[in-house]
């Protein structure tokens, strides 16, 4: 049985950036595990720990020694290893010397590409304790730290100054230098509750020692659970429920080693402000959890977390109440000031903001979007004037004080201000919903005008940025065009909107006045859209070949595309599917090889099998036409599946490329007719068996 032991590494430092703590913790674990894999060291399980002042990794049952192994070095080919006289060539002798061996110690390796000289050397495995320091140093140097810093007189660099390091393998310290500090077994507890050194007897004592002696909850996830539970209990104590968002929960966990809840209060007059304003003020500025009532409205309370068990918690409460008061007062001031000017009165001020140098100002974008919105509304038989009005106002809340202070409230404040201005309810709702979906899986607009405006705004942005030559590459997508494109597709598909996305693109491109190659831009955008559609389909559980089968017939209405791919997925489950897919592939290959144009009409046929196929194909053609008109592609494919036996009989009994030209043309025309019936839905020859 291979000897093993537990490994603990902890790096203690000044408070780490809270928004990157979890990412740093996971990256350190991943890097160390990658180093162990590279060193051929096995282990049982591994866990990462992270608090504001430490990153740690605990690995169970880590192999104590590398296994001995045979290292094989390959040298020159045998044909180059000997001279004309049969003596070893310089290449062979040089290879032997580089291995520290004689020519006689070399062996031969036969492969399908030839025979080679090789040298096999037994390498004794190293002790894990000797390998760990370099693995850790490399892991730390590869952490995703945007800006590293130096401290004292050290050359070491890290996200924050390092104060201690624990490195234990079993109960033994691996003595080394990590980022300018000597490793040992002494950790440190809470900065105020337990600032003294904490002796870690063994790796598995780490978590309990910090908890019991150090007032530190080392496990990030456990701190999140504790914070969530404590916030919920504290909210219940004042008759409410904690409003907890995951991002803030993570950030608060990254700010506290020993989180203690504190309930604070604010003046109920502030509840007259939009709820989102209060929530943003408390969350963004103060890292507070708001408290809601059972109807979903806010209560005049908040929950904050102190990183200390205070002997005077009332002072912490009052201090936080004093701090949040001016923040809420500022929000109240912005709300009152902004309402002195309507959104409509702010439209002209959009001319002061450049959207993109080739695409003009936000006012010019607004005018383009309004035209697109009117076009879309007309096609959907929606209220054109409401769509134009919603588009006209869509970006005006960017000119308000509130959105200037809280950018994440764009659209939300537009809705509130539009309602306050007396705008139509659908226009007001569209101010917020045209930004939907905001993230992957997020809700699409619920209102028709919001759907129209969302499409118009995103299409204009997509077409415009591509026309300016700013095409996303790799992970660079400054205008979030991937998200915008997926948003277009989701709005169309998930709301049952049967618009042609290429027609919308053409309408958008026609509005730009700057010089660009329209045809080239159009094709690039179309490719980009369908690349996003492929990703969407794969996420929905469709396969790549099902997507390619539908893409081959070039449907440009995403909703129609989804109806087709759903039908193809169902079709391929039929017992006839594999045979028909193979037959279609054969038909397409036959038609491609034809040296002459294939006649549109089918002439005389002589064999019973081909006459039967013609009759069956004519019958199916008649029956699927109304199904295609209804976009009932599933029933249409089910009907075409009934052709299997007739198609198989044709290929079993008929030679297509007969010497009789007229007969050959008739048979080719018959196959073209059959192929075209399937191609009205999808190219099922793309389906893999």
Question: Where are these predicted regions, by residue range?
Answer:
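Amphipathic alpha-helical "coupling" segments that flank catalytic cores
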Residues: 1-689
């Amino acid at each position: 049985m291979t000897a093993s032991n537990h490994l603990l590494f902890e790096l203690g430092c000044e408070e780490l950036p809270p928004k990157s703590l979890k990412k740093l913790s996971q990256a350190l674990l991943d890097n160390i595990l990658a180093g162990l894999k590279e060193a051929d060291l096995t282990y049982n399980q591994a866990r990462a720990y992270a608090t504001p002042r430490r990153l740690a990794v605990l690995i169970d049952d880590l192999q104590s020694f590398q296994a001995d192994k045979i290292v094989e070095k390959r040298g020159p080919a045998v044909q180059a290893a000997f001279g004309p006289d049969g003596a070893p060539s310089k290449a062979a002798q040089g290879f032997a010397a580089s291995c520290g061996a004689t020519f006689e110690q070399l062996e031969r390796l036969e492969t399908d590409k030839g025979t080679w000289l090789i040298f096999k050397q037994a390498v004794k495995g190293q002790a894990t304790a000797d390998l760990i320091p370099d693995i850790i140093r490399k892991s730390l140097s590869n952490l995703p730290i945007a800006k590293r810093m130096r401290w004292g007189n050290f050359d070491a660099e890290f996200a924050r100054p390092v104060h201690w390091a624990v490195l234990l393998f079993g109960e033994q310290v691996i003595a080394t230098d990590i980022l300018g500090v000597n490793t040992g077994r002494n950790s440190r507890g809470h900065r105020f509750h337990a600032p003294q050194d904490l002796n870690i007897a063994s790796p598995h004592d780490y978590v309990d020692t910090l908890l019991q002696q150090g007032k530190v909850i080392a496990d990030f996830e456990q701190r999140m659970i504790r914070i969530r539970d404590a916030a919920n209990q504290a909210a219940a104590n004042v008759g409410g429920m904690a409003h907890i968002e995951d991002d803030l929960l993570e950030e608060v966990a990254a700010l506290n080693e020993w989180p203690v809840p504190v309930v604070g209060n604010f003046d109920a007059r502030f509840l007259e402000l939009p709820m989102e304003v209060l929530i943003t003020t408390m969350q963004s500025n103060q890292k507070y959890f708001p408290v809601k009532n059972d109807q979903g409205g806010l209560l005049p309370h908040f929950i904050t977390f102190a990183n200390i068990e205070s002997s005077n918690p009332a002072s912490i409460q009052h201090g936080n109440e004093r701090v949040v008061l001016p923040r809420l007062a500022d929000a109240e001031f912005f709300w009152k000031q902004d309402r002195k000017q309507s959104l409509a009165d702010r439209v002209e001020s959009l001319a002061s903001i450049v959207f993109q140098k080739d695409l003009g100002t936000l006012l010019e974008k607004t005018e383009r979007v309004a035209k697109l919105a009117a076009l879309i509304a007309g096609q959907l038989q929606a209220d054109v004037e409401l769509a134009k009005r919603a588009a006209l106002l869509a970006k005006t809340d960017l000119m308000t004080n509130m959105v200037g202070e809280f950018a994440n409230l764009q659209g939300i404040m537009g809705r509130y201000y539009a309602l306050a201005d007396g705008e139509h309810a659908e226009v007001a709702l569209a101010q917020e919903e045209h930004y939907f979906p905001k993230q992957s899986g997020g809700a699409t607009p619920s209102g028709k005008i919001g759907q129209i405006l969302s499409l118009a705004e995103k299409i204009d942005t997509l077409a415009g940025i591509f026309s300016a030559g700013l095409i996303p590459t790799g992970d660079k997508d400054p205008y979030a065009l991937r998200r915008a494109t997926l948003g277009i597709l989701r709005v169309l598909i998930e709301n049952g909107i049967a618009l042609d996305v290429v027609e919308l693109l053409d309408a958008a491109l026609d509005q730009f006045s700057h010089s660009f190659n329209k045809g080239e831009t159009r094709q690039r955008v179309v490719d980009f859209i369908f690349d996003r559609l492929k990703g969407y389909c794969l996420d929905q559980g469709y396969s790549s070949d099902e997507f390619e089968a539908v893409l081959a017939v070039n449907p440009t209405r995403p909703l129609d595309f989804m109806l087709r791919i759903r039908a193809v997925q169902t079709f391929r489950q039929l017992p006839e599917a594999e045979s028909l897919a193979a037959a279609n592939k054969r038909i397409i290959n036959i038609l491609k090889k034809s040296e002459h144009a294939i006649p549109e009409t089918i002439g005389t046929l002589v064999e019973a099998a081909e006459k039967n196929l013609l009759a069956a194909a004519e019958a199916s053609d008649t029956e699927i036409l109304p199904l295609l008109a209804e976009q009932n592609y599933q029933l249409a494919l089910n009907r075409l599946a009934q052709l299997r036996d007739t198609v198989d009989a044709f290929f079993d009994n008929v030679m297509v490329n007969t010497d009789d030209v007229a007969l050959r043309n008739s048979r080719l025309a018959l196959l073209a007719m059959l192929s075209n019936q399937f191609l009205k839905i999808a190219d099922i020859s793309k389906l893999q068996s």
